[in-house]
């Protein structure tokens, strides 16, 4: 190996040895506690299918919420 390559290798090894561990073991803990988990709205199941909705409304799913909504007509 040439002296330039050896010097480069030595420099890279020096930089690697100086890096902080990725795990963050040397970092101090942040003060305080985590706040309580935010309340999510309860899952509401107003309908199971379109036929359980009044008139022309359709049963629409938004996450865990099922509700009857007026349909949209596209031309």
From Swiss-Prot:
- Single GO biological process annotation from the record: venom-mediated disruption of cell wall in another organism
Name the domain of life this protein comes from.
Eukaryota
Keywords from UniProt, A to Z, are: Antibiotic, Antimicrobial, Disulfide bond, Secreted, Signal
Q: What is its main location?
A: secreted
A GO CC annotation given for this chain: extracellular space
Between which residues do disulfide bridges form?
A: 43-64, 47-59, 53-68
From the UniProt entry, list the residue stretches annotated as the region Disordered: 23-42
Which Gene Ontology terms cover its molecular function? serine-type endopeptidase inhibitor activity
Which interval of the chain is the signal sequence? 1-24
Report the locations given in the UniProt record. Secreted
Regarding tissue, the record states: Expressed by the venom gland.
What this protein is called in its record is: Veswaprin-b
Q: Which taxonomic lineage is given here?
A: Eukaryota, Metazoa, Chordata, Craniata, Vertebrata
């Amino acid at each position: 190996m040439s002296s330039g390559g050896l010097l480069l290798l030595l420099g890279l090894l020096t930089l690697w040895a100086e890096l902080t561990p990725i795990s963050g073991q040397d970092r101090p803990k942040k003060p305080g506690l985590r706040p309580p988990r935010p309340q999510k709205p309860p899952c509401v199941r107003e309908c199971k299918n379109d036929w359980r909705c009044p008139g022309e409304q359709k049963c629409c799913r938004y996450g865990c919420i099922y509700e009857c909504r007026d349909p949209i007509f596209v031309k």
